[in-house]
């Protein structure tokens, strides 16, 4: 059985050594559930698919939700775990079994927390959003996600990262007239027309937005270009896929309108293919403010999209905070500094009390 009350570094290693690729989390969920039932007193514990949920009912004035996903990307020859000096190596070491270990250890060792606690260990975060276990819990058990602040244990190198950017993908398509390239004047080259789109992107200046002391830098980038029929054909169609990462003060609708404004006047068709709203940091809320104080005021904006957006949609302030370097997530040499693990335990113990 997992030892939740022992060394959280050893607990991290034990979690890493349980393979848990997305959709194959049954074993790790079984282990987590059994350990919580045996070692975390005062929690109501339930199972939802391959997700494990636990909560206290201490009638505290505020509730803190700790959320972590149990799944990892496919193993890349990086199991079992191994310790080298101050680094713990293995699949999921940073993303995010070290964060899970911190939450599990605290659940079993906090005697008198000053907040009520909810823990959500969920499945299928690393694959398509439609399969995400947190989304399923939101649909099937919405009362379990009620909280005054949520902490998602994604790797942040031990710094609190508030909110997250939104993301929007669109395809800009242009049309022309097909012709033999030997008689190019009879055609209208669609690929050439993309030049005007790329020119707009080349001179675009992304904005930076300060929200609750966090600076969110936006980005509007071409990520794919498609076109061409054959080596002797003037193409009659071409497209460029654009990804807009926008600050959380903009809605998806406002982000889409901004893209239309940027390319206004060009003869292009704009089709939205994917979008997810960002999450405001909400650091002015009392429960979130206390967390920032426990961290000594060290907080920064989160770049990229994470599940904190799901909490923001519910009106719950949410932050990312966990051990490990996010740049090492999904790498063959994924690892976490063991000092990050103990530091996260210490900080959250100060914040949660007990």
UniProtKB/Swiss-Prot annotation:
Pathway per its UniProt entry is:
Amino-acid biosynthesis; L-lysine biosynthesis via DAP pathway; LL-2,6-diaminopimelate from (S)-tetrahydrodipicolinate (succinylase route): step 3/3
Q: What keywords is this UniProt entry annotated with? A: Amino-acid biosynthesis, Cobalt, Diaminopimelate biosynthesis, Hydrolase, Lysine biosynthesis, Metal-binding, Zinc
Look up the record and name the cofactor or cofactors this protein needs: Zn(2+); Co(2+)
Cofactor binding remark: Binds 2 Zn(2+) or Co(2+) ions per subunit.
Q: Name one Pfam family in it.
A: M20_dimer
Provide a GO biological process annotation.
diaminopimelate biosynthetic process
Which EC number applies?
3.5.1.18
Q: Give the active-site positions.
A: 71, 125 (proton acceptor)
Q: Which SUPFAM superfamilies match?
A: Bacterial exopeptidase dimerisation domain (SSF55031), Zn-dependent exopeptidases (SSF53187)
**Reactions accelerated catalytically:** N-succinyl-(2S,6S)-2,6-diaminopimelate + H2O = (2S,6S)-2,6-diaminopimelate + succinate
Q: Which residues bind Zn(2+) 1?
A: 69, 95, 154
Question: Which GO MF terms are attached to this record?
Answer: acetylornithine deacetylase activity; metal ion binding; succinyl-diaminopimelate desuccinylase activity
Q: Which residues bind Zn(2+) 2?
A: 95, 126, 330
Family of the protein in this entry: Belongs to the peptidase M20A family.
Q: What does this protein do?
A: Catalyzes the hydrolysis of N-succinyl-L,L-diaminopimelic acid (SDAP), forming succinate and LL-2,6-diaminoheptanedioate (DAP), an intermediate involved in the bacterial biosynthesis of lysine and meso-diaminopimelic acid.
NCBIfam families attached to this UniProt entry = dapE-gram_pos
Q: How does it assemble?
A: Homodimer.
Q: What is this protein called?
A: Putative succinyl-diaminopimelate desuccinylase DapE
Species of provenance: Mycobacterium tuberculosis (strain CDC 1551 / Oshkosh)
Q: Which gene encodes it?
A: dapE
């Amino acid at each position: 059985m997992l030892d939740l009350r022992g060394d959280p570094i050893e607990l991290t290693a034990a979690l890493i050594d349980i393979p848990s690729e997305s959709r194959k989390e049954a074993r790790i969920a079984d282990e987590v559930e059994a350990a919580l039932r045996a070692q975390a007193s005062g929690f109501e514990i339930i199972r939802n698919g391959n997700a494990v949920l636990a909560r206290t009912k201490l009638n505290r004035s505020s509730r803190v939700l700790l959320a972590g996903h149990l799944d990892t990307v496919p193993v890349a020859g990086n199991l079992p775990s191994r310790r080298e000096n101050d680094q713990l190596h293995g699949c999921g070491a940073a993303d995010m079994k070290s964060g899970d270990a911190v939450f599990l250890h605290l659940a079993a060792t906090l005697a008198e927390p000053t907040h009520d606690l909810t823990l959500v260990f969920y499945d299928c975060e690393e694959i398509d959003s439609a399969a995400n276990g947190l989304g399923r819990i939101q649909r099937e058990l919405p009362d379990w996600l009620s909280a005054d602040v949520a902490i998602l244990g994604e790797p942040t190198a031990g710094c609190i990262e508030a909110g997250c950017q939104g993301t929007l993908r669109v395809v800009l398509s242009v049309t022309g007239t097909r012709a033999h390239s030997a008689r190019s004047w009879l055609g209208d080259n669609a690929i050439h027309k993309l030049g005007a789109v790329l020119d707009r992107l080349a001179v675009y200046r992304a904005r930076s937005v300060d929200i609750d002391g966090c600076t969110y830098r936006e980005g509007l980038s071409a990520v794919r270009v498609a076109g061409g029929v054959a080596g002797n054909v003037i193409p009659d169609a071409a497209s460029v896929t654009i990804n807009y990462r926008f600050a959380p003060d903009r809605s998806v609708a406002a982000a889409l309108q901004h893209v239309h404004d940027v390319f206004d006047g060009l003869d292009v068709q704009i089709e939205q293919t994917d979008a997810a709203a960002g999450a405001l940091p909400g650091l002015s809320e009392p429960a979130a403010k206390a967390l920032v104080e426990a961290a000594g005021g060290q907080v920064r904006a989160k770049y990229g999209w994470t599940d904190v957006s799901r909490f923001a949609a519910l009106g719950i302030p949410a932050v990312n905070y966990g051990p490990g370097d996010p740049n090492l997530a999904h790498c063959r040499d994924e690892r976490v500094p063991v000092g990050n693990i103990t530091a996260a335990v210490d900080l959250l113990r100060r914040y949660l009390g007990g």
